[in-house]
Amino acid sequence: MASRVNTSFTLIPKQKCRRSNHHSSYFCNTLDSDPQLLSTLGNFKVLPLEILHIILRYLSVKDIGMLSMVSKTVSQHIINYISTSSGSRRLLLQNFHDLDLPGTKEETALLEHYRALGLLFKRCTLLLPTKERLKYIHKILSEVSCFKFSGCSVPLQCLGLSCYGMFLQTLTAGWDELECHRVYNFLCELTNLSRKMQTVVCNKPGSARKLELRVRLFCRNVLLDHWTHRSDSAFWLTRILKPWPMVNQARLLYIIFGPTSPHDGQVIWQEMIEGPTDESSLKGLANAIKLLYDTGAKGWTADDVISLVDELSVVPREWLLENNARLLILSGNNICFTFMASKAVNGRAVELARLVVFLALVCEKELYCMDWTVRMMQKVCKVFSTAAERKSFLQSIANAFACVTMEMLQPVMSGDRDDDDRGFLNLFHLLHAQANFHKEVLYLTMNAISS
């Protein structure tokens, strides 16, 4: 008696493909039309689709990615598996809120999973045009609400956008600029990002705090934070900033990298205006400025970056000069000197002299070497074309020390003191800064005489 064939599984058809099988129709037609492609499945050709899917379930994402490179047929099989409900459930992990603290093993493992998933999609869609790749990937990822711009109700406690960013970074790594432009435009169209940016940069600062936070999180977690090479980060930051006028670029830079509240994550607009701030509040802005300046990002000249720094120092209103000085120090020697030289060339010597005073004050507070401030002043002096201009600049510095001292002394003398004596302490640091500054000038003079 002929043995009965077990029909509980769907066998891969050799002659004709059923039209009702939507996920595998393309695959079946391909096999029918070219028998050679059937051999590219190797030993898998005798397996029912369900068995192959079970095997894929036991493979790691990295192993599935390696398997997808065997042949176009195998790759198409894996794409079909990803499109199934069981495949998407297994691959699109969504435990974004079950993590206790940043940097834990669980968080690292989840990010690594999406890095591997990005590589898998990169390999499976290798032969598709960029536009088709993006459409297919969006179709799969759209099932995950936390990957959407406003898809999560608790964005500060969610790792979704970071995983999405890790996925995109791995997917697009090595793509040329034109393809990356298309990716950015696709994301902007998908999320209406440009319109949302327009809302936060054109309205009064703080009037749309929740939207500011969403823009910040999307730009940082999806577009900027996961790149290994600084040039890649500079490329994406340029895409974000360059469509806007300089004043809006500064606002957007502050939203993305400026200080935020530890309680609700919202941007603190008054931080630079109300009092001296600390390094942590300025570090993100300084790093972004250095990124654009040091990498020689396409579309940015030194003058562009300096203009951006100048514009940033009045967002939302003019900063305390101490905070401006701290930003310049954190931005590095080249940016600091170029910024100061620009003021010297444009005849703003008095303003520049006050800046020197606050550079000295920050160095005193943070225990930086005061010799740095003196040498920076000496370098800027050479920008002035005549001896009379240099002498006038040095006199302006002496006058600035006296004026700033009197400004800080007045509230102390009037008894208008803070609960924490901040004003008195600031005056104390300024007097020490002045003494150490002039000590370094004397050392410099003595060394010049002895040589």
Curated annotation (Swiss-Prot):
The keyword Cytoplasm appears for this protein: no
Protein keywords: Ubl conjugation pathway
Domain F-box residue range list: 41-91
Superkingdom of origin: Eukaryota
InterPro entries according to UniProt: ARM_FBXO47, F-box-like_dom_sf, F-box_dom, FBXO47
KW Ion transport (keyword) present: no
Xref: Pfam families: ARM_FBXO47, F-box
Self-association and partners: Part of a SCF (SKP1-cullin-F-box) protein ligase complex.
Family matches, as PANTHER family: F-BOX ONLY PROTEIN 47
Functional description taken from the UniProt entry: Probably recognizes and binds to some phosphorylated proteins and promotes their ubiquitination and degradation.
Protein's name according to its UniProt entry: F-box only protein 47
Gene name tied to this protein: Fbxo47
